[in-house]
């Protein structure tokens, strides 16, 4: 199969729709399907497990290495408390700008609110690895200088445009075209 013509808008749209969605998707924050189960917290603070954990599930006590994305944008784990308490609606909830305490819980990562980690964002590896492309030439000026006509001889011509201008009348009689349908003279009526 040949490559599509990417000069047309329909081909461009078709090509973008066929891209791998994982390249531009938001990363999934759940590490295993067991995180999706609704778990009731035990008064001791440890979430209950209904059975043996699957082989792919994450152990809450184990340290998971941070990804490059997590290092660059300063994420932390969300507390495993009730939903109202994490959103600041529960009893004893503090202001919205305070960071939630990192407790070993379900392992869901949350991005910070506001400028909490501005220093971490300023020192990302993307900024360190950036190199400006040197192959760029400066753009040319788009202003076009008006051309001036310089005459070497003087004439009796007045500079105003209407001084003596007269449009030439050209009357040309065209040769008759026998294949033309409506070439009849005006008073003649064609019966179709």
From Swiss-Prot:
This protein's record includes keyword Ribosomal protein: no
Domain of life: Eukaryota
Gene Ontology cellular-component terms listed: cis-Golgi network; Golgi-associated vesicle; microtubule
Region spans: Mn 1: 123-136
Record key words, sorted: Calmodulin-binding, Cytoplasm, Cytoskeleton, Golgi apparatus, Lipoprotein, Palmitate, Phosphoprotein
Gene Ontology biological-process entries: cytoskeleton-dependent intracellular transport; microtubule cytoskeleton organization; negative regulation of microtubule depolymerization; regulation of microtubule cytoskeleton organization
Lipidation sites (S-palmitoyl cysteine): 5, 10-11
Family assignment from sequence similarity: Belongs to the STOP family.
Post-translational modification Phosphoserine, affected residues: 38, 160
PTM remark: Palmitoylated. Palmitoylation enhances association with microtubules.
Function: May have microtubule-stabilizing activity.
Species whose genome carries this gene: Bos taurus
Name the record gives this protein: MAP6 domain-containing protein 1
